[in-house]
Amino acid sequence: MGYKLLLMYIAIVIDSVIGTAEVMSHVTAHFGKALEECRDESGLSPEILNEFKHFWSEDFDVVHRELGCAIICMSNKFSLLKDDTRIHHVNMHDYVKSFPNGEVLSAKMVNLIHNCEKQYDDITDECDRVVKVAACFKVDAKKEGIAPEVAMIEAVIEKY
């Protein structure tokens, strides 16, 4: 009996992780649509712009200051930041919840971003700080098992 219960628990945990990664693929695909609009404003080179679609891959380094500027611009398109360029918790919760099954990811995503923001709060340049927060979030999301595979993003990108 205990063995069956353990297997059921493992299946639920795996389903939950896959579910949150799937939601993250929707969030990433939708959020990424604003990148082209923000390219000129942020000074993002065409090379980095092209690489951004691989944000979640191991090969993509989240290091360029211009990427931080682009993320600020993109976030502002969806009202996800406060005036001090820190996460707007309520708006981010609402944004993530707007996707299918978003409620399973919302709190975890906001918490991870907020914890990363605290680590880099002393950086005064907004673009530098935001790119550090994004890199931290990518690492932590992978640790938590909520980072989507690139194929998952490609599968849903046409919806947005």
Swiss-Prot record:
GO terms for biological process: sensory perception of smell. It comes from the Eukaryota. SMART domains: PhBP. Transmembrane segments: none annotated. Antenna. Disulfide bonds join 38-73, 69-127, 116-136. Keywords: Disulfide bond, Olfaction, Sensory transduction, Signal, Transport. The keyword Transport applies. Residues 1-19 form the signal peptide. InterPro entries: Odorant/phero-bd_Lep, PBP/GOBP, PBP_GOBP_sf. One of its GO terms (molecular function) is odorant binding. The keyword Disulfide bond applies. Gene3D superfamilies: Pheromone/general odorant binding protein domain (1.10.238.20). Belongs to the PBP/GOBP family. Present in the aqueous fluid surrounding olfactory sensory dendrites and are thought to aid in the capture and transport of hydrophobic odorants into and through this fluid. This is General odorant-binding protein 2. It comes from Antheraea pernyi.
